[in-house]
Amino acid sequence: MLSRRIFIATAAAAAVPATAAGRVPRVVFLDPGSPAPQASGPMSRAAVDFMTIAAAQLGIKLEVLHANHDHLLMIRHAQAVAARAEPPDYVVLVNDKMAAPAMFDALAPSPARLFVIHSDVTDEQRRDTGNERERYPRWIGSAAPDNTHGVFRLVQALHNALGARPIRALGITGPHSTPVSNERARGLTDYVASVPGARLEQLVYGDWSELDGHRKAWVLLARYPEANLVWAANDEMAMGALQAASGHNAPVVVGGMGGWTRALRSIADGGLTATLTGHHLIGAWALVMLYDHANGIDFASDGGLRRKLDYLHVVTRTNLREYENTFGEHERPIDFRRYSKVYRPQLARYDFSFAPLLARLN
């Protein structure tokens, strides 16, 4: 899928005359995941996929260094980048396992500017690091999906599927050491708290894997036989939970996050009820802003230095076809130059929302 997406997007870019030919920035992405399909979640691969497409279209030299889910290797990559005789212009990194401050320190000798995506530096960490462009002046910005509001909408869709039954919810989020796990879980707890009579039976931490999702859900469904809603913080764990529900013959609705191909097929077949998608675009949106920054347009003037992008999209059987027309096997290419103020000087504000994207491509 990666090579096909890149071929289509690159061909489309070549077919459309560019309206700008700015400076070509060099960007290194310190990916916490792995390039191996069996070792990295589909969302991680898709994020790199769309960053590669965006870089090719915009005119960015992108290099990806994979850490294989080892935060110490991620820090060593940062140290190696800082020691380069020819440093990149920008380094994009993820606060996976709370490692961003260590990478800030590792990259301090480098003139490269730093941009955090996906998993933000937490408020607690910021008491030591300060905010963007303060203690670390070359840390120029951050952008992350608004996971809390996105999960709130996802659980609302699961609730709608329950009909009149009162919510008896179970939740499986990611590792405690990863800030995004708690952000996603907060969407579940916020929604349950907003509904009179709803109850969250238990929320547990997982390791993002389908096997762990199955194990956790199997135990929880046995412990809470009245549970009727299972939320998981990614599609892999959701698929495992769905298998556990089938094994228990439990009448539950199950939702995940990521837009994984198997999850979409499961929704079409009446298995999963919903998934929350769009995380795979956060790196591409960051590259749009960095390209503009490299060419004299500072994104800080439009949305600030620390951005929570509330664009995540709930997919159910109702809107599955529309979503697959854009991101499925027969996807239409996204032209990321349309979102750049360098390529489109008429843009007054960045708009990274999902609805216009779907409308434009369908």
Residues of each region from the PLM?
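N-terminal secretory signal peptides and thylakoid transit peptides that target proteins
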Residues: 1-12
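Beta-alpha junction/loop-to-helix N-cap segments that form part of ligand/metal-binding clefts
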Residues: 68, 73-128, 237
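Venus flytrap/periplasmic-binding-protein-like
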Residues: 114-127, 231-273, 281
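Hydrophobic alpha-helical segments within soluble ligand-binding/sensing domains
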Residues: 74, 135, 140-168, 259, ...
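Extracytoplasmic "Venus flytrap"
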Residues: 25-50, 54, 63-76, 94-98, ...
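Periplasmic-binding protein-like
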Residues: 85-95, 113-118, 170-171, 203, ...
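Flexible loop/hinge segments that line or gate small-molecule binding clefts
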Residues: 106-148, 263-266
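Hinge/cleft segment of the Venus flytrap/periplasmic-binding protein
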Residues: 172, 285-362
